[in-house]
Design a protein with these regions (language model features):
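Short, amphipathic alpha-helical "lid/cap" segments that border enzyme active or binding sites
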Residues: 64-68, 72, 177
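Catalytic-site neighborhoods of secreted/periplasmic enzymes
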Residues: 1-67, 78, 97-98, 105, ...
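A general marker of short, structured functional hotspots
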Residues: 29-32, 70, 116, 120
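Active-site-proximal cap/lid insertion segments
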Residues: 40-59, 74-81, 86-200
C-alpha cells in the first residue's frame, strides 16, 4: 500500500507510524516508515503487545500512554533531521479482538469494554448520560442495521450502550487529549515547535 510516508522518507525525513494500523490484523511494517510501532488489529488497552520495527515487544501501561511515550522518543531521537510522526491512538475503541473472519472476542487477561487510564477512571461517574429519543429503538426501515450478524443480538434495547460504558468511553479521550500536549511541550523544549506543522 503506497502511502505519503514513502516520498517523505525518500526526501530525507525520518518517518514514524505509531499506533493502531488496523487494516486487517496484519501489523507488518509498511514501506516508507523509518520507525514502526503498531499492534495487531485492535490491540490491547493495558500492557499492549507491539510490533516495534519488526520485533514483538510487550509494553507496560495504558496503551495511550505507551504510544505517546514512543512518539516522544521518536521526536527526541530525530535530532536535527526533519521528521514526520503519525500517531494513531487505539482509544476510543473498546478492548476486544477482531478475528480475520470478522468475528470478535475478548482479550485474555484484559479488562473488557472501554478502558480509560486509571488516572481518568471515574472522572464522569456522576455525569448524566444524554440519550437521543431513538436510543434503544429497533432500526425499522434500515435494512443494513437489521442484518443478522452471527453471535450478536439484533440492534435494539439488548444492544444499547449502558451509561457505565458511555462514561468510560468519555473518559478514554482524556488520555488522548493529554498526548498532543506532551508532544507540543517536548517540541517547545527542543526548540522545534515553531518549525513543526501539527495536524490533529
Amino acid at each position: 500500500l503506497p502511502t505519503f510516508a514513502i516520498p517523505l522518507e525518500a526526501a530525507g525525513y525520518r518517518t514514524a507510524y505509531i499506533g493502531k494500523w488496523h487494516m486487517g490484523n496484519d501489523d507488518t511494517r509498511r514501506p516508507g516508515w523509518t520507525r514502526w510501532v503498531a499492534m495487531k488489529g485492535q490491540g490491547e488497552a493495558i500492557d499492549p503487545m507491539l510490533n516495534v520495527d519488526g520485533e514483538r515487544q510487550q509494553a507496560t501501561g495504558h496503551v495511550t500512554d505507551v504510544l505517546t511515550d514512543y512518539a516522544l522518543e521518536f521526536v527526541t531521537e530525530s535530532g536535527g533531521k526533519p521528521f514526520m510522526l503519525f500517531l494513531a491512538h487505539k482509544a476510543l475503541h473498546p478492548n476486544f479482538i477482531q478475528r480475520d473472519d470478522g468475528s470478535t472476542g475478548t482479550v485474555a487477561g484484559q479488562p473488557e469494554g472501554f478502558v480509560p487510564a486509571d488516572r481518568h477512571r471515574g472522572r464522569y461517574a456522576s455525569a448524566t448520560v444524554p440519550r437521543r429519543p431513538n436510543a434503544g429503538v429497533a432500526p425499522v426501515r434500515k435494512p443494513a442495521l437489521q442484518r443478522e450478524i452471527p453471535g450478536l443480538p439484533p440492534l435494539g434495547t439488548a444492544t444499547e450502550t449502558s451509561d457505565t460504558d458511555v462514561r468510560a468511553r468519555l473518559e478514554m479521550p482524556l488520555g488522548v487529549d493529554e498526548s498532543p500536549g506532551r508532544i507540543l511541550q517536548l517540541l517547545e523544549e527542543l526548540g522545534k515547535l515553531e518549525n513543526t506543522v501539527v495536524t490533529l
